[in-house]
Design a protein with these regions (language model features):
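A short macromolecule-binding patch
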Residues: 252-260
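Short nucleic-acid-contacting surface segments enriched for D/E, G, S/T with interspersed K/R
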Residues: 259-279
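Short aromatic-glycine-enriched beta-strand elements
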Residues: 241-246
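Surface-exposed loop/turn elements that mediate protein-protein interactions on large endomembrane-trafficking
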Residues: 248-250
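Mixed-charge, low-complexity intrinsically disordered regions
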Residues: 1-231, 282-472
Length: 472
């Protein structure tokens, strides 16, 4: 039997276990069930073929939490072999990836039951299962991380087609759905896919694909990726190795690898095109053009592109300035307010915000639509400026929060760790690292205190996991 046929047959056995143990109750369509079986089998294939990808989970977890996996008791754990805890974690991740508005308990009894049976199958097969030489040879290539083009291809594979990629793939598909479908859709989608491969951290340990592959291949090197936003550039010089570009906004001169420009587009250089709008990616000290470019000579197109860039840069500058103002004048890293009068007084009298026409009505509408009984907490960070937490305020145990309520917090504090709609990632990290969500707990058949300890022992991991999409 060929290696492919062996693992296909094994995946069918895993699928049968998922069906018989009730996983279909949460993965409610046949495609999702088959996909889960394939991913779990691919994990086993990785374990049997050098344990290259999954070893990163163990390494990073030890670095961050002092044990080989989050959530589970690993006192009886054997790295590089089939472990029920590994299968539980991966199956939990697969199931959780399908739920945006529901938290699945990693100790879910159905997941544990399925993982136990699957682990038994893998244990039986472990000594005789074939290694996948193609995967081992692919990851053993010494240039897979250092060479930009090989690295880009590997990152696309990891972010969309590896057994660890489900959340990353779902995110990209959702991003495609949000785009207007017009003549530019496929060009935009191509760029989005490439950039996603470089910057997404939607994997179990919240690393980028490059970081994961670097660790998996045991190459001790720093991966320096600079994600530059779309920009406008004037072409100053075309060379054999690099283009010399000038940023149309900042005036900064940049050298970009010539090989990264589309060969068909290069022919249009003869037409005298001197300005382009594109995405640049910095990889290990060199700049590459990534995705599609706009090189329309019409003045109105250029002005429209530049306007969008200026607006984005202005928002970034305002965020940094707002953060500095908050740090200087707020009086505390987090401030609790209630009602429109307190909210406006804090903005105008404390932070020095100028009250423009309609400011009060705008703030009243915001509090009415977003806050619970007019209660909000305010913070800041340099990337987003002022941050407002508008829900579950009584769940925050801070010395200066007059509305903290333990009974309320026991039911609602978890939301502030996992629901990005309620607050920014920076705010969630601040609350966790400063011990302000001590009552957060998962519902557990073993009681509230067990569910609380499960969350508290894995609080930072949970924030990073559930907010990963919103910190890319």
């Amino acid at each position: 039997m060929s290696t492919d046929m062996y693992y296909t047959a094994l995946a069918n056995r895993v699928l049968k276990v998922l069906e018989e143990t009730g996983i279909s109750a949460v993965l409610q369509n046949e495609d999702a069930m088959r996909d889960a079986a394939v991913r779990l089998t691919a994990w086993f294939e990785d374990i049997c073929s050098g344990n290259m990808l999954w070893s990163v989970v163990n390494t990073v977890s030890r670095q961050r939490f002092g044990k080989p996996l989050p959530f589970y008791d690993t006192s009886n754990y054997y790295p590089g072999e089939p472990n029920i805890q590994d299968i539980q974690l991966l199956l939990w991740d697969i199931i959780q990836s399908h739920y945006q508005d529901r938290i699945i308990n990693p100790e879910n009894a159905g997941i544990e039951m399925a993982a136990d049976v699957i682990c038994g199958i893998f244990d039986e097969e472990y000594e005789t299962a074939p290694e996948t030489e193609e995967l081992m040879e692919y990851l053993a290539d010494p240039t897979i991380v250092s060479d930009y083009w090989k690295a880009r291809k590997a990152m696309e594979w990891f972010s969309l087609d590896s057994y660890l990629s489900l959340r990353s793939r779902i995110d990209l598909m959702e991003a495609f759905e949000e785009q207007e479908y017009n003549e530019m859709f496929h060009l935009k989608a191509y760029t989005m896919r490439l950039v996603h491969a470089f910057v997404s951290q939607r994997y179990l340990m919240q690393l980028t694909a490059a970081e994961w592959l670097s660790m998996a291949t045991h190459r001790e090197m720093n991966i320096d990726i600079t994600h530059m936003q779309p920009g406008g550039y004037e072409i100053l010089q075309r060379g054999e190795e690099t283009f010399l570009l000038r940023d149309l906004i900042s005036g900064e001169e940049l050298r970009v690898q010539t090989e990264s420009f589309d060969t068909g587009w290069l022919k249009t250089m003869a037409l005298g095109i001197k300005k382009i709008f594109c995405q640049l990616i910095g990889y290990n000290g060199k700049l590459y053009q990534c995705g599609t470019m706009v090189s329309d000579p019409r003045k109105e197109v250029e002005e429209r592109q530049l306007k969008a860039i200026r607006e984005r840069l202005s928002m970034e500058d305002n965020a940094r300035y707002s953060h500095e103002i908050f740090q200087q004048k707020a009086g505390a890293p987090i401030v609790f307010l209630r009602g429109i009068d307190e909210f406006i007084d804090f903005h105008i009298k404390r932070l020095g915000t100028k009250e423009s026409a309609g400011f009060r009505k705008k703030m009243e509408r915001y509090l009415r639509e977003n806050s619970e009984q007019g209660m909000v907490a305010m913070m800041s960070d340099p990337e987003h400026g002022f941050l407002t937490i508008s829900s579950a305020i009584p769940a925050i145990k801070a010395p200066n929060n007059p509305w903290y309520n333990q009974a309320y917090a026991q039911k609602n504090a978890l939301n502030l760790m996992v629901q990005h709609q309620s607050l920014d990632y920076y705010a969630a990290v601040y609350l966790v690292e400063n011990g302000m969500l001590p009552d957060a707990a998962l519902t557990s058949t073993k009681g509230y205190e067990h569910g609380r300890k499960l969350v508290q022992n894995n609080a930072r991991y949970m924030v990073d996991y559930f907010f990963a999409k919103h910190k890319d």
